[in-house]
Amino acid sequence: DGQAVHQSSDGWVPVYTDDSQCLGVMSVGFLLRSKNDSVVWRGPKKQGMIRQFLSDVRWGDLDYLIIDTPPGTSDEHISLMEAIHPYAPQAVLVTTPQAVALSDNLRSLDFTRKVGLPVIGLIENMSGYVCPHCAECTNVWGRGGGASLAEQQGLAFLGRVPIDPTLVRLLDDA
């Protein structure tokens, strides 16, 4: 909150998570006048922004560039693949344990296969709720859907990430 993207002679400077500048973040949200503004763009405008984020942001020397996309196989995904294909990208699929999310991930996996995007593996996010008082993990939305999907599809299962209120609070305060 309160972070802004700055323009330099080399391009946009991403927002950094701390003074070490080890983790730079870029979001359309940083470019809006108000955090309550909506983004109502059609394909060409979205495609242009994707290209701008990849070419006009001063990323510096990167070990990794993590691109978080919504589930699905929209124009944005196709545009993104066209733009990053020369860099030999790889994907990590992220799901939640519910059946509807697993179904979305099957479509995403089908997309990666059709466009030749190698998948490193799958992560199950929101895999249980960690009680802030006793640290017990309750599986609110079930458990094991991600591991099961990974096994069925021949993917590496990279692990589970529970909902942790302490982490949520820390991120909100950052």
Question: What residue ranges belong to the model's regions?
Answer:
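Short gly/ser/thr-rich secondary-structure transition/capping motifs
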Residues: 5-8, 47-50, 74, 139-140
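A short small-residue
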Residues: 27-34, 86-90
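C-terminal boundary of histidine-terminating zinc-finger modules
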Residues: 171-174
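Conserved catalytic-core segment of NTP-binding enzymes
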Residues: 64-169
